Every structure is written in C-alpha cells, then in structure tokens.
C-alpha cells in the first residue's frame, strides 16, 4: 500500500532526485507556466507543497505538488504537477483529501489534458467543470 507523506520545504533538496522525474513528466505536458527548476524553488520557498507516495519499503513511487488558493467562495487545493507509478488510486486520493480537509480546503482542482481528466474522474471522483483555453501574446 502507498501512504501519502508531506515533504517539508527544508527537505526538498534531499528528496529532489527521487521526485524530479515524476514531476518533470507532468511539467512537460503542462502550459509552460513554470520549469522543473522553478517548481523546485517554489517548493523550497513554501509557495507550494510537495506530497509524495511512499511504499512499504519507504521508496517514493510518485509525487504531487499543490498550491492552496483562497477564492471568495472556496479554499482550493490546486494540483500543479502529478506523476508516478500507481499513485492515482481511491486510497491515495482519500489520504490527500483527508489532509486537504485539515487545511480547510473545500475543493480540489487541476488543469489537465483529456486523458488525464478521465483518470481523475475514474480514480478520484473528479468532475469536468470547465475547459481552459489559452493564447500566447
């Protein structure tokens, strides 16, 4: 079974080699809002949080980065990157949701491609709420 653990900002540099490939895959399919090195800095400065999935041998099998955003009507846990092996399961999501509730979070959201959206729906009970369009200027 995979258990979810938070990585304190002080330990980002110690675990970085174990998580960077998981996060890089997600960053590369993103919208170029940040690079992998920039994400590392955001984590180290505590602007975002690193959550890891660890197996029974304490081996990191996946990683997720999140940012808590306060909107007028919701406190949202926004997933900025996610990757790993077997880390999108209902058991793992329940652990993430339990932690998020302790932080006062009322919603979890993520930007993702269509295939990723299907996985979020199937494994974690997400709903497609809106489509994001973008144009570079």
Please identify what each model-predicted range represents.
Residues 45-87:
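Conserved donor-binding loop and adjoining core beta-sheet/short helix segment
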Residues 3, 20, 48-52, 62-65, ...:
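Ordered hydrophobic segments in well-structured contexts
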């Amino acid at each position: 079974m995979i258990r979810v653990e938070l990585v304190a900002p002080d330990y980002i540099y110690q675990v970085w080699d174990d998580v960077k490939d998981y996060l890089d895959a997600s960053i590369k399919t993103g919208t170029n809002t940040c690079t992998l090195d920039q994400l590392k800095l955001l984590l180290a400065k505590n602007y975002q949080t690193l959550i890891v999935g660890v197996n029974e041998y304490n081996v990191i099998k996946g990683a997720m980065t999140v940012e808590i955003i306060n909107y007028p009507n919701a406190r949202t846990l926004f997933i900025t990157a996610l990757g790993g092996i077997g880390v999108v399961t209902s058991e793992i999501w329940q652990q993430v949701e339990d932690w998020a509730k302790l932080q006062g979070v009322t919603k979890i959201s993520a930007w993702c491609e269509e295939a990723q959206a299907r996985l979020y729906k199937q494994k974690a009970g997400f709903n497609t709420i809106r489509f994001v369009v973008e144009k570079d200027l």
